[in-house]
Amino acid sequence: MRWNRMNPFGSYKKVVSARSTLKEVLKKAQDGGIVSTAFIYGLENNLLDGVIVADNAGEFKAVPKVATTPEEVLEAAGTKYTVCPNISVLKSAVREYGCEKIGVVGTPCQVRAVRKLMKYPVGFRHVPDKIALIIGIFCMENFPYYGLKLIVEEHCGVKMEDVVKMDIGKGKFWVYTRWGETKAIKLKETHPYEQIACHVCTDYTAELADISTGSVGSPDGWSTVFIRTAKGEEIFNKMVEDGYLEVKPIEEVKPGLGLVEKLALQKKEKNMKEIEHRKELGLPIPY
């Protein structure tokens, strides 16, 4: 188990750069397609019988969905830069779908919530022991849907109905249209539209997940992957052995782990200041 002296990443067993080998995933994936590939692999190999994903309800409105087939996972592939209450369908996955081995993907705060739920299952009887895999995605901040819509339509000048993809990288928020146009604004212009609770979250890399992944640190089309637990290591190794993933040592890619560390520490330091400020004012900390 490795620990950085500043502990920007939490505990992990290893970190690599990886991408899916599944053509159908790469066509829809945001970056390396790690989440979709892991869920497809789990469903195809009886390691999972249901997964909770963020589906696109139209114009990038994210809604939680219980997917039980690889086809349903593919339909939901791709990042949505808006809040999606994935945990709200955990009970449904067990009681309505009859799932016994559930895969969950979420932002760092959602991963933390799932871990708390597993330890203190108040109101979630018979759910914790059904959670088989937790995948976390890197997250600096997120947007409520109305905030995302203002960013896209007011700042980028694009109608939501014309957007085919969004991305965050190189200090900018990118919007790609069905007409082949690309619009971008500086990331700092999006800060007023962030979810308020994001300002007191100190976790960038989903430290409590079995596997954490995000684009930062890896080349275009690849993802940086933290394998954190024995459970995560087992399924990740199986995916590599069975040819579902292509892997490179993180030390051999650019920009590398240094950029991930920079952003992780930046989030911790910035938001710890906000937490202390709120404490001084006697304000509640929603985390």
UniProtKB/Swiss-Prot annotation:
Keywords: Iron, Iron-sulfur, Metal-binding, Oxidoreductase
Molecular function in Gene Ontology: coenzyme F420 hydrogenase activity; flavin adenine dinucleotide binding; iron-sulfur cluster binding; nickel cation binding; oxidoreductase activity, acting on CH or CH2 groups, with an iron-sulfur protein as acceptor
Alphabetized Gene3D superfamilies for the sequence: 3.10.450.750
Record note on cofactor: There are 12-13 Fe atoms per alpha/beta/gamma unit of the FRH.
Catalytic activity: oxidized coenzyme F420-(gamma-L-Glu)(n) + H2 + H(+) = reduced coenzyme F420-(gamma-L-Glu)(n)
The keyword Metal-binding belongs to this UniProt entry's keyword annotation: yes
Top class in the EC scheme: oxidoreductase
Record's signal peptide: none
Pfam families: FrhB_FdhB_C, FrhB_FdhB_N
EC number in record: 1.12.98.1
Cofactor dependence: Ni(2+); iron-sulfur cluster; FAD
Family: Belongs to the FrhB family.
Complexes and interactors: Heterocomplex of the form (alpha(1)beta(1)gamma(1))(8).
Physiological role: Reduces the physiological low-potential two-electron acceptor coenzyme F420, and the artificial one-electron acceptor methylviologen.
Protein name stated in the entry: Coenzyme F420 hydrogenase subunit beta
Organism: Methanocaldococcus jannaschii (strain ATCC 43067 / DSM 2661 / JAL-1 / JCM 10045 / NBRC 100440) (Methanococcus jannaschii)
Name of the gene this protein is made from: frhB
